[in-house]
């Protein structure tokens, strides 16, 4: 029972970290703010965080609403629930990578709250690609299947965050990611294993064709290490922004794969 209670504490803390969903104070009594162990719950927390968007997809699918309108609303709800946390990371990362002449200038740009050209373009592409991918495949699934596919994608994208986080050292001291700690090896394994397993089961329940499932996992397997190598070359480590960007890029890759193969 103690292990289950600790896992649920980690789920609650992960939900608080990854979203704007209110979490009761009792989960934070005596908590030091570290996420080294709590990251194991990221995939489970992702499913809870994505339930509102999945419900919207189900309702609009059952009402036979326009696929483009449904896709826009689903992405909008996701951004509202998370407070656009991951989108902010993608925008800052794009500005830093695109405008930074070297490591130091890239990190300095990423600290600037103002959005630049590279960040704006990255966000337009992220929203556009996710909306177009959802509009392409949601009408081909049942309303229930569409909602479940969103949950599967969410679990994979948050597992990707943990992998990126664990593979690189902090690029700077005092950042959000550095203060949250480094994922414990066991927690990283649990996050990756549970993320992949949950996604596999949920894709099956959603009625996703086998070829689409494997293509989505291939996209996951290419996007996450690929971006991590770029971050290592550009910054020599991770930041909170690159962790958020990992989530966005993984979601785009997986949704794009589903749109191509379903």
UniProtKB/Swiss-Prot annotation:
GO cellular component terms given for this protein: plasma membrane
Transmembrane segments: 41-61, 65-85, 115-132, 134-156, 195-215
Membrane association type: Multi-pass membrane protein
Keywords attached to this entry: Cell inner membrane, Cell membrane, Cobalamin biosynthesis, Magnesium, Membrane, Transferase, Transmembrane, Transmembrane helix
Any one biological process term the GO annotation gives: cobalamin biosynthetic process
Cellular location(s): Cell inner membrane
The protein's annotated pathway: Cofactor biosynthesis; adenosylcobalamin biosynthesis; adenosylcobalamin from cob(II)yrinate a,c-diamide: step 7/7
Reactions performed catalytically: alpha-ribazole + adenosylcob(III)inamide-GDP = adenosylcob(III)alamin + GMP + H(+); alpha-ribazole 5'-phosphate + adenosylcob(III)inamide-GDP = adenosylcob(III)alamin 5'-phosphate + GMP + H(+)
InterPro entries: CobS
An MF annotation (GO) of this entry: adenosylcobinamide-GDP ribazoletransferase activity
Major localization listed first in the record, in broad terms: membrane
Cofactor (UniProt): Mg(2+)
E.C. no: 2.7.8.26
PANTHER family: ADENOSYLCOBINAMIDE-GDP RIBAZOLETRANSFERASE (PTHR34148:SF1)
Protein family: Belongs to the CobS family.
Function field: Joins adenosylcobinamide-GDP and alpha-ribazole to generate adenosylcobalamin (Ado-cobalamin). Also synthesizes adenosylcobalamin 5'-phosphate from adenosylcobinamide-GDP and alpha-ribazole 5'-phosphate.
Protein name, per record: Adenosylcobinamide-GDP ribazoletransferase
